[in-house]
Curated annotation (Swiss-Prot):
Family: Belongs to the universal ribosomal protein uS11 family.
Role played: Located on the platform of the 30S subunit, it bridges several disparate RNA helices of the 16S rRNA. Forms part of the Shine-Dalgarno cleft in the 70S ribosome.
Coiled-coil spans in chain: none
Protein name as catalogued: Small ribosomal subunit protein uS11
MF-aspect GO terms: rRNA binding; structural constituent of ribosome
SUPFAM superfamilies found in the cross-reference section: Translational machinery components
Alphabetical UniProt keywords: Ribonucleoprotein, Ribosomal protein, RNA-binding, rRNA-binding
PROSITE patterns xrefs: RIBOSOMAL_S11
BP GO annotations: translation
Domain of life according to the entry: Bacteria
Tagged with keyword Aminoacyl-tRNA synthetase: no
Organism: Lacticaseibacillus paracasei (strain ATCC 334 / BCRC 17002 / CCUG 31169 / CIP 107868 / KCTC 3260 / NRRL B-441) (Lactobacillus paracasei)
Subunit record text: Part of the 30S ribosomal subunit. Interacts with proteins S7 and S18. Binds to IF-3.
Lineage: Bacteria, Bacillati, Bacillota, Bacilli, Lactobacillales
Annotated PANTHER family: 40S RIBOSOMAL PROTEIN S14/30S RIBOSOMAL PROTEIN S11
């Protein structure tokens, strides 16, 4: 077993001009995933993956950094414009969208795809702090 080579999978450059940026903003974290129009993942990032811990993950600044990291990675694959699909009630929604625009990606549309129940299951009880 000595001298065995491990081969790492080479990153393939996907040539994708436009795609969809899915921003999932929860009360605890913000996830940004950039896909092609069919839904195949090209790049992703989150506040936790960037090293933010605990309550710092839920800040708008952490969401901004996550969106910036995902946008830079997707631009290496040739991405130029994105539609934005925002989901969730978190504080990082607007910051992530602004960050995508600031990195040089053209935002063509913004959709809110937050799931709204038609009176489904009972929600968790209200916090008393």
């Amino acid at each position: 077993m000595a001298g065995r080579k491990t081969t790492r999978k080479r990153r393939v450059r996907k040539n994708v001009e436009s795609g969809v940026a899915h921003i999932h903003s929860t009360f605890n974290n913000t996830l940004v995933m950039i896909t092609d129009p069919r839904g195949n993942a090209i790049a992703w990032s989150s506040a936790g993956a960037l090293g933010f811990k605990g309550s710092r993950k839920s800040t708008p600044f952490a969401a901004q950094m996550a969106a910036e990291a995902a946008a830079k990675e997707s631009m290496e694959h040739g991405m130029k414009s994105v539609e934005v699909a925002v989901k969730g009630p978190g504080s990082g929604r607007e910051a992530a969208i602004r960050s995508l625009q600031a990195t040089g990606l053209e935002v063509t549309a913004i959709r809110d795809v937050t799931p709204v129940p038609h009176n489904g299951s009972r929600p968790p009880k209200r916090r008393r702090v």
